[in-house]
Amino acid sequence: MPASFLVLGDQLSTDVTPWPTLSSDTVILIIETEHLTQAPRHLTRTALYLLAMRAFAERVRSLGFTVDYRRASSFAEGIAAHRAEVAPTEIMMNHPRGRRAASLFTRLGVTLLDDPFYLTPLDEFRSAVTTAKPATMETFYRRQRRRLNVLMNGDDPVGDRWNFDEENRLPLPKGGGTWPAPWSRALTDEEQCAVDELAASHPGGDAVAYWPRTRGDALDQLTDAVTRILPHFGPYEDAASTTNWHLAHSRLSVAMNLGLLHPREVVDAVVAAYNQGLIPLASTEGFLRQIIGWREWVWGWHQLRDDSYRSLN
């Protein structure tokens, strides 16, 4: 009997481990649980999640894998039904990001592999925050720059500065400024029908077109970000507007959080654009600080601390 590989809705990549080593007879299990379609959940969030999962299932089928895409009231029910029908030798999955989810899948007998969607293994993060005095995001970020060799000339930062905070903390221009339109892709008829079905029971407007649903969307959005949006990012990265919701932000976090983009490929694309003269150094540094610094810093503490951490301050 084949093994099965369970994929969650925030793990939508075939380019990370263990995909390159999966046998062609591995059954890919994707479970759409009922809580995803139960109110109250924002319409755009719910529709985006489901459309991305369904598109991923089609992509995996096109690669020759057998896909068991099923609806269930819970993961426990879905996994039990899959075991009864497929009788896999093993069900494995990349490590889920939530503690409760990890505990649940362990109880359900699923083998948890490492999480390949971040750049910093837990042991590395633990070492970083226990050896640095004080353990601040800035010291961690500089360590990341060296470890990942991002914007470095040997052991020194490109431009001989670790940050460009002075340049990157400007207020909005008088009058609010003019900003590049955000990336978008119109919904297909099939996608629109799925959104319409959800609209009756989910609050909020339909903004799904502004977010990627497929790997192709995510790559297109990444190209758009590095060529059209990020050149304007740095000076106003900390500014906020009451009339413009996107300013010059890349909005790539959704693609990364769904697994449609890996943070390393985002970093490499932005560095390549800087090397081509497309993005100023201050904007490049300010953006990469978010990806290899803040994103990894927050994720590391989430792994390292238990739930009591939320009430410490």
Question: Where do the model's predicted regions map?
Answer:
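Flexible loop/turn segments at secondary-structure boundaries
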Residues: 13-15, 36-38, 76-77, 100, ...
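Short His-Asn-centered micro-motif
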Residues: 6-10, 31-32, 70-73, 93-96, ...
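N-terminal beta-strand-loop-alpha-helix module at the start
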Residues: 1-70
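Active-site cradle of extracellular carbohydrate-active enzymes
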Residues: 285, 290, 295-313
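Glycine/tryptophan-enriched, flexible segments
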Residues: 148-287
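Short helix/loop capping segments that flank catalytic or ligand/cofactor-binding pockets
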Residues: 15-17, 38-39, 234, 264-266, ...
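Beta-rich, aromatic/charged-enriched effector core domains that present basic-aromatic interfaces
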Residues: 75-211
